[in-house]
């Protein structure tokens, strides 16, 4: 491994920036992290373009941390910017980047891809699907609960990151001219308003400039860092880990608590994994090791050198690192970089919401595709404006990036701990690692995560409660929806009958047949849906052709066309159809009918009637049924409200509304 690392470093130092010379470096990078150099993204020019795109999406959050991270290390703990403290904190920052990002995420977590996709819900689905222990159902339930809580915490992070990033960028105006101070908050709100208004138009057109802008940003970070380090080369002592250890030992509790601010340098780590499906592992690793990491280390060390020479610069070392003539351009570039970072996070929250809907943890909501080419380009109005309200509230309440830093970090540390736990399960169950190997590697990561989490706990009374409360609310909603749907499914199944029994009854007592085709949607592919039984009971008539359609979501991101549709003709002109989708896909009725047509089952859309059940949930007071794990009455009422306000299947599955019949069903839970 070390020989490959040396080859990689030598290739970087001796290669000129052309594709032919860089390709061996890419191959060495794959070898260091144990990746097969498969045909995926083999072309070097494609890898470079994807790496550039990854800069604009994946590294926005972690790339804007220099705006506030080092400043916050000295802001709340009574630590003076003495040479010993500066070198010690820089050492902690450097080794946090190495251990948390380079080793944990780049070398191990990125391996845990779910058919190429990443993210905490994708990892949860992979961990659940991989369970092979004796007590499978219990362990699957545990992994699901842990994963849901991790996803819920990321919603809290998604609201704080835009607020703290843009505020910290705008605060640079006070160095340009102190009279700008009263306008910081109004300008931040203006930028946020424009950002969230822009979402409905999508980012397909302007997204192409995100990568180049972030490349300029990282280049400027590196140049500013070199400028600062040139004035005091003693900062290179921070590369030695014993300085960080001595800092922790010499400063006691204050030294431990400063880890809460040190963690701010890696708050964008989850994005590396979440966006793996968009860019692939190689481009993300390439962008990190060749661009983002060097630029970040140079800038943090440059800020440290500035503090060694001028401790008074601790009030804003990032902007004071720049020459005075460059302050205004730096504020403008910082604002663009933080807007791009915020955009990436908003898109990430949209993606998590879509996955949660498909996996059955969230009610159906209106999802608008903003690009005909990119499946990931979506806009969810209710999520967008909920985030907007939350961000504006944070800006008006906390007012400065330093105040917001007190609320930042604890939710992300919780999510990173959960990622470690889920990755451990994948290593044990899917990769077949021994308990000793899995525990040694991921146990070490968990100790690191717990240290950061413990250092952030003290933030709870000072604003850290905000992301935790947001996460708790989202977690409550997701688990209530999941549990409520399970109870509803059981109630509907009680009213159903096996499709084989139903067909035998049709053969014995043939009903009147109406011309045309009827497609009944059902949650259970093996039972007859209540609307069909209702129709037979009251109307005693059946369409000439009847299909019972069930849409199932698998624990994989995408389902191949070959496995999309399963069709069985139970008896002549009575079909059972199962449409399989991944959690990254959104089912559409026209696509399902087209897949049926390719199987020689032609449903003419204009002559087809779609029959759906419309459940009215009645929250029943009293004890649960014997042997059934139900919900508290207030959660049953909450589920009833969520069900009532969920988007109707007609709109969600894009079914022609003038061909839909909805049959009302009252269900007590």
Swiss-Prot record:
Superkingdom of this entry's organism? Answer: Bacteria
Q: Which reaction does it catalyse?
A: K(+)(in) + H(+)(in) = K(+)(out) + H(+)(out)
**Keywords on record:** Cell inner membrane, Cell membrane, Ion transport, Membrane, Potassium, Potassium transport, Symport, Transmembrane, Transmembrane helix, Transport
Where is the protein localized?
Cell inner membrane
Parts of the chain that traverse the membrane? 47-67, 86-106, 144-164, 172-192, 206-226, 252-272, 288-308, 326-346, 378-398, 404-424, 435-455, 460-480
Molecular function terms in GO for this entry? Answer: potassium ion transmembrane transporter activity; symporter activity
Membrane topology, as annotated: Multi-pass membrane protein
The record, for InterPro entries, names:
K+_transporter, K_trans_C, K_trans_N, Kup
Q: What GO terms fall under cellular component here?
A: plasma membrane
Major site of localization recorded for this protein? membrane
What task does this protein carry out?
Transport of potassium into the cell. Likely operates as a K(+):H(+) symporter.
What protein family does this chain belong to? Belongs to the HAK/KUP transporter (TC 2.A.72) family.
What protein am I looking at? Probable potassium transport system protein Kup
The encoding gene is kup
């Amino acid at each position: 491994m070390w020989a490959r690392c040396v080859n990689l470093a030598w290739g970087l130092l001796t290669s000129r920036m052309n594709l032919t010379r860089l390709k061996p470096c890419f191959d060495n990078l794959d070898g260091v992290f144990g990746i097969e150099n498969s045909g995926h993204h083999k072309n070097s020019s494609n890898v470079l373009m994807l790496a550039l795109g990854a800069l604009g999406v994946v590294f926005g959050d972690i790339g804007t941390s220099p705006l506030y991270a080092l400043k916050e290390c000295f802001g709340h703990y009574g630590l003076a910017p003495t040479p010993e403290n500066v070198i010690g904190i820089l050492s902690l920052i450097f080794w946090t980047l190495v251990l948390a990002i380079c080793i944990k995420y780049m070398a191990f977590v990125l391996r845990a891809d779910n058919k190429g996709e990443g993210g905490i819900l994708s990892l949860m689905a992979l961990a659940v699907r991989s369970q092979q222990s004796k007590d499978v159902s219990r362990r699957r339930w545990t992994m699901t609960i842990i994963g849901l809580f991790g996803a819920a915490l990321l919603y809290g992070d998604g609201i704080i990151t835009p607020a703290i990033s843009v505020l910290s960028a705008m605060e640079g105006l006070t160095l340009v001219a102190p009279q700008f101070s009263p306008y910081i908050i109004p300008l931040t709100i203006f930028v946020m308003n424009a950002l969230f208004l822009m979402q409905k138009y999508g980012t397909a057109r302007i997204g192409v400039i995100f990568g180049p802008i972030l490349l300029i940003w990282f280049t400027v970070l590196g140049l500013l860092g070199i400028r600062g380090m040139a004035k005091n080369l003693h900062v290179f002592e921070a590369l030695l880990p014993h300085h960080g250890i001595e800092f922790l030992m010499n400063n006691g509790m204050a030294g431990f608590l400063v880890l809460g601010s040190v963690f701010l340098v890696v708050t964008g780590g989850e994005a590396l994994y979440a966006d793996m499906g968009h860019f692939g592992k190689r481009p993300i690793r390439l962008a990190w090791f060749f661009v983002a990491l060097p630029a970040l280390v140079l800038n943090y060390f440059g800020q440290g050198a500035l503090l060694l020479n001028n401790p008074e610069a601790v009030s804003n070392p990032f902007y004071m690192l720049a020459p005075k003539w460059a302050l205004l351009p730096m504020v403008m570039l910082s604002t663009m970089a933080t807007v791009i970072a915020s955009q990436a996070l908003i898109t990430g929250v949209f993606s998590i919401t879509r996955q949660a809907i498909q996996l059955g943890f969230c009610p159906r909501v209106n999802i608008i595709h903003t690009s005909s080419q990119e499946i990931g380009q979506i806009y969810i109005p209710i999520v967008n404006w909920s985030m907007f309200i939350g961000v504006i509230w944070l800006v008006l309440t906390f007012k400065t990036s330093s105040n917001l830093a007190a609320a930042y970090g604890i939710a992300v540390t919780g999510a990173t701990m959960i990622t470690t736990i889920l990755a451990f399960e994948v290593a044990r169950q899917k990769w077949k690692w021994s308990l000793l190997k899995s525990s040694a590697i991921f146990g070490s990561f968990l100790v690191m995560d717990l240290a950061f989490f413990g250092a952030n706990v003290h933030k709870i009374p000072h604003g850290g409660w905000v992301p935790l409360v947001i996460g708790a609310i989202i977690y409550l909603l997701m688990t209530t929806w999941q549990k409520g749907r399970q109870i509803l499914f059981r109630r509907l199944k009680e009213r159903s009958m096996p499709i084989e029994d139903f067909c035998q009854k049709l053969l014995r007592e043939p009903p009147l047949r109406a011309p045309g085709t009827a497609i009944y949607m059902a949650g259970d592919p093996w039972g007859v849906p209540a609307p069909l039984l209702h129709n037979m009971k009251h109307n005693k008539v059946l369409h000439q052709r009847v299909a019972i359609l069930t849409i199932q979501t698998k624990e994989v991101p995408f389902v191949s066309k070959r496995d999309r549709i399963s069709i069985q003709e139970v008896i002549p002109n009575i079909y059972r159809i199962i449409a399989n989708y991944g959690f990254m896909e959104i089912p559409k009725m026209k696509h399902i009918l087209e897949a049926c047509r390719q199987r020689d089952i032609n449903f003419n859309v204009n002559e087809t009637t779609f029959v759906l059940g419309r459940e009215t949930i009645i929250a029943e007071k009293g004890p649960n049924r014997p042997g059934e794990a139900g919900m508290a009455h207030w959660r049953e009422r909450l589920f009833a409200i969520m069900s009532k306000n969920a988007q109707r299947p007609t709109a969600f599955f894009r079914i022609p509304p003038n061909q839909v019949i909805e049959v009302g069903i009252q269900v007590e839970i």
